[in-house]
């Protein structure tokens, strides 16, 4: 059973199927960080063929610092503070609290998105707060980085206790945007026999409430104005999380 709800310029959106009521609400009040920047200074390969050193610079943004309002918003929060979300080929991100770190990459083309993240894992959404690049052994393996991209960020992993009540929904858009007359993102949440769908027409952070304990599947699809799936790498995005 499922219902589809269109989320155009609303604050709270409901999907009600049988006895499970799930809500999606726009997250408000986070520091904007409109002047914050993330710069990639260099990528150096190590002796291992798959290990790389990454060097970044952050401006107007302090890694390791708690974001104002982090405790009050009720979202899962990193005790280590603000950080960089590092995503390879749209796989689950790794969090980095220093500007320099090493990563093991696969022996294939690696499309890398890195962006600034608040301590409660909400991305900083400005044109200078992210980098998109790729690391490939063979030039022929590289993809077109001018595509319209959607990268999945949150929710992620296992949530316990109070952290299960309110889940941040966050994704990162590159070379595209959302509007009531343009592209949109369709969110599908599946839990047991329940399916909930929401259509998002603005690029903002949201939070999900009303899910039961257990496994939850999420799918994000970047759609064009005709509601067709945009043909681009990593579209759609699929994840499974666990609420304990």
Which residues make up each language-model segment?
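Surface-exposed, short loops/turns at beta-strand junctions within beta-sandwich domains
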Residues: 103-109, 208-215
């Amino acid at each position: 059973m499922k219902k589809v709800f269109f989320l155009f310029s609303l604050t709270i959106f409901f999907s009600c199927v049988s006895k499970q009521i799930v809500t999606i609400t726009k997250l408000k009040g986070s520091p904007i960080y409109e002047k914050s920047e993330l710069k990639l200074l260099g990528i150096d390969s190590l002796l291992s063929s798959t290990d790389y050193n990454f060097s970044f610079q952050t401006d107007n943004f302090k890694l390791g610092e708690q974001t104002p309002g982090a405790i009050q918003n009720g979202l899962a929060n990193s005790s280590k503070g603000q950080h960089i979300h590092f995503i390879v080929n749209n796989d689950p991100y790794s969090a980095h609290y220093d500007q320099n770190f090493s990563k093991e990459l696969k022996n294939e083309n690696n499309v890398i998105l890195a962006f600034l993240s608040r301590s409660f894992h909400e991305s900083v959404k400005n044109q200078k707060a992210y980098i998109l690049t790729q690391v490939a052994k063979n030039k022929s393996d590289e993809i077109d980085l001018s595509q319209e991209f959607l990268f999945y960020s949150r929710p992620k992993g296992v949530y316990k206790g109070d952290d299960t009540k309110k889940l941040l929904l966050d994704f990162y858009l590159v070379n595209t945007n959302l509007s009531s007359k343009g592209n949109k993102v369709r969110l599908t949440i599946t839990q047991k026999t329940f399916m909930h769908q929401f259509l998002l027409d603005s690029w903002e952070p949201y939070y999900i409430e009303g899910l039961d304990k257990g496994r939850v599947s999420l799918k994000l699809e970047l759609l064009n104005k005709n509601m067709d799936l945009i043909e681009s790498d990593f579209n759609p995005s699929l994840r499974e999380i666990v609420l304990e």
